[in-house]
Design a protein with these regions (language model features):
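Fold-level signature of zinc-dependent metallopeptidase catalytic domains
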Residues: 80-255
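N-terminal helix-rich structural modules
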Residues: 1-134, 138
Length: 255
C-alpha cells in the first residue's frame, strides 16, 4: 500500500473514520486495491478528490518527473547506477534536495524488522528443513537487503507449505519497471495432483538442455525444476500471482 502512493496511509485513516455504508464499502474496495483506484477499471478513482494513480508509485521523489529521474540515473557512475535502478531501492531527496538511492531495508526498516521477527518465529515452529531454511534466509534478507540466498532457498522448497514473501513484481513502477513491490501469498502443496505432473516435470531439464539458449540463462543444476500444483490460501498486495524471484541470476520454474 505504501509503495503504491504516498497518500495511501493518510487516506486509510480517513476511511476508517467513516462508519456509513458508503464509507465501509469504499474502505473494503480500498483494501482490495491497496489504494483508491480500481485495478479492474484501468485504475479509475473510486474515491472523490484523489489524484490520478502515480505511474511511478511511491518509489520516486514527490514532484520529480520521469525525465528528471532518467537524467539523474544517466549521469551516475556504474555502481551508483546499479543501486538506483535496482529492484530493492527507492529514490529520495537528501538534505540538499539531490536524488539518492535508499535501500528497502532502510526505507521500510520498522515494517521489515517486524516481518523478519515473524518469519524467524515461523522457522522455529516448523520441522520441515527446506521451509525452515527459506524462512530464516528470507528474514535475514529483509534486514540485509540481499535477497539472492533466500531466492535460492525459495526455489529449493520441498515442503507442504509454499510461501512467497518479499519484493517481487515490478508492475507498480510504470515508469521503468525497476522497483519490486512487496507481496505475500501462502499456498499448500497438493501432493496427489503434483504426482500426476511428475511424468512431465521430470523431463523439463532434458527439454531445456536442447533449447537454443545460452548456458548462462539455463536453470542451475541444483535447482529442482519440477512443476508443483498448489492451493492458494492467502494473497496480499497484487491482483496477480506470478511471484518469481526478481534477481536476474535466477528464473522461476514453479507452476
Amino acid at each position: 500500500m505504501r509503495q503504491t502512493w504516498a497518500g495511501n496511509e493518510m487516506l486509510l485513516l480517513k476511511l476508517l473514520e467513516d462508519s456509513t455504508l458508503l464509507g465501509r464499502t469504499r474502505l473494503d474496495y480500498f483494501l482490495v486495491n491497496k489504494g483508491p483506484w480500481s485495478r479492474l477499471d484501468d485504475d479509475a478513482a473510486f474515491i472523490p478528490g484523489v489524484p490520478e494513480k502515480p505511474a511511478g508509485g511511491n518509489y520516486y521523489p514527490a514532484g520529480a518527473t520521469r525525465a528528471d529521474v532518467e537524467a539523474w540515473i544517466a549521469g551516475l557512475a556504474p555502481a551508483a547506477r546499479e543501486a538506483a535502478t535496482g529492484f530493492f531501492t527507492t529514490i529520495r531527496r537528501d538534505a540538499g534536495g539531490k536524488f539518492m538511492a535508499v535501500p528497502y531495508s532502510l526505507e521500510y526498516q520498522g515494517e521489515l524488522a517486524e516481518m523478519a521477527g515473524h518469519l524467524r518465529a515461523a522457522a522455529a515452529a516448523t520441522k520441515q528443513p527446506t521451509l525452515k531454511s527459506f524462512l530464516e534466509s528470507r528474514a535475514a534478507a529483509l534486514i540485509s537487503n540481499d535477497y539472492y540466498a533466500s531466492d535460492v532457498a525459495w526455489m529449493k522448497l520441498d515442503s507442504s507449505i509454499e510461501p512467497t514473501i518479499g519484493p517481487y513484481e515490478v508492475y507498480e513502477d510504470e515508469w521503468f519497471n525497476y522497483k519490486a513491490a512487496f507481496e505475500a501469498f501462502i499456498a499448500v502443496r497438493d501432493d496427489a495432483e503434483t504426482a500426476k505432473l511428475d511424468r512431465f516435470g521430470s523431463e523439463l531439464q532434458w527439454l531445456e538442455d536442447r533449447l537454443p539458449i545460452e548456458v548462462l540463462v539455463r536453470t542451475p543444476d541444483d535447482i529442482d525444476s519440477r512443476a508443483k500444483l498448489i492451493d492458494l490460501l492467502e494473497l496480499a498486495h497484487g491482483m496477480e500471482t506470478e511471484g518469481p524471484p526478481p534477481d536476474m541470476r535466477l528464473k522461476p520454474r514453479e507452476s
